[in-house]
């Protein structure tokens, strides 16, 4: 199975109606044309992939090696650079633009993003644990429960308070509702990880139902 992919920014959520009146919640992803910066092959790199750049940035923020790298593709320095494997290398050359029409309505995709960060949180909010007794005289309300008296150590994987969110997560098998090449927009059914204006990666689903 060959993979297609594109980088974009999450704009937010809205809803669309189908011809039969069904309401579908969708996530709007703005994906300006991505540029292929490098085509990697087994002979030169040991694996096959394409390197893609998304969103221009000021040249003053790039060093000479980065400028020289993007100059081979006749483009400007890019803010985000990612790789896509399992692609049909014959369809891409350095400098090729990847637009939203690489996907069509009905395609099934996986969307990867970085979840919202919530800072340091306790077990109840972070892990969904239950509160303790809230009555007068109770010695604990929102603390973690006992870890046991004998083992004299904390088991690996024990759920404890800590930082919540800001993790890379992938939502699988989302359906593309529509694409708009003029506005560089993809509408995907359902929600995707990340805050508004965060960068997301859209790829062909690896577990799509046939």
Swiss-Prot record:
Extract the InterPro entries matched here.
Ribosomal_uL3 (IPR000597), Ribosomal_uL3_bac/org-type (IPR019927), Transl_B-barrel_sf (IPR009000)
Question: Which gene holds the coding sequence for this protein?
Answer: rplC
**What biological processes does GO assign it?**
translation
Which parts of the sequence are annotated with region: Disordered? Answer: 120-143
GO MF terms, alphabetically ordered: rRNA binding; structural constituent of ribosome
Which top-level group of life is the source organism from? Bacteria
Tell me its family. Answer: Belongs to the universal ribosomal protein uL3 family.
Task: Specify the protein name.
Answer: Large ribosomal subunit protein uL3
What is the protein's species of origin?
A: Latilactobacillus sakei subsp. sakei (strain 23K)
What keywords would UniProt list here? Answer: Ribonucleoprotein, Ribosomal protein, RNA-binding, rRNA-binding
Any one GO CC term of this protein is: cytosolic large ribosomal subunit
**What the protein does?**
One of the primary rRNA binding proteins, it binds directly near the 3'-end of the 23S rRNA, where it nucleates assembly of the 50S subunit.
Q: Note the subunit structure.
A: Part of the 50S ribosomal subunit. Forms a cluster with proteins L14 and L19.
């Amino acid at each position: 199975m060959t993979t297609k992919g594109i980088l974009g920014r999450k704009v937010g959520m809205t809803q669309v109606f189908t011809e039969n009146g069904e309401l579908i919640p969708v996530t709007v992803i703005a994906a300006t044309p991505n540029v292929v910066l490098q085509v990697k092959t087994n002979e030169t790199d040991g694996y096959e992939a394409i390197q893609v750049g998304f969103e221009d940035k000021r040249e003053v923020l790039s060093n000479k090696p980065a400028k020289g790298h993007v100059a081979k593709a006749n483009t400007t320095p890019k803010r985000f650079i990612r790789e896509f494997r399992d692609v049909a290398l014959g369809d891409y050359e350095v400098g090729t633009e990847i637009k939203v029409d690489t996907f069509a309505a009905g395609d099934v995709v996986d969307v990867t993003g970085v979840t919202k960060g919530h800072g340091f949180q306790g077990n109840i909010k972070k892990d969904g644990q239950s509160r303790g007794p809230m009555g007068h005289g109770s010695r604990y309300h929102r603390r973690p429960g006992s870890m046991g008296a004998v083992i004299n150590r904390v088991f690996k994987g024990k759920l404890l308070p800590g930082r919540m969110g800001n993790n890379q997560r992938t939502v699988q098998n989302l359906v593309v509702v529509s694409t708009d090449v003029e506005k560089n927009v993809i509408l995907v059914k359902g929600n995707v990880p990340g805050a508004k204006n965060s960068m997301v990666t859209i790829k062909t689903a690896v577990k799509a139902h046939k």
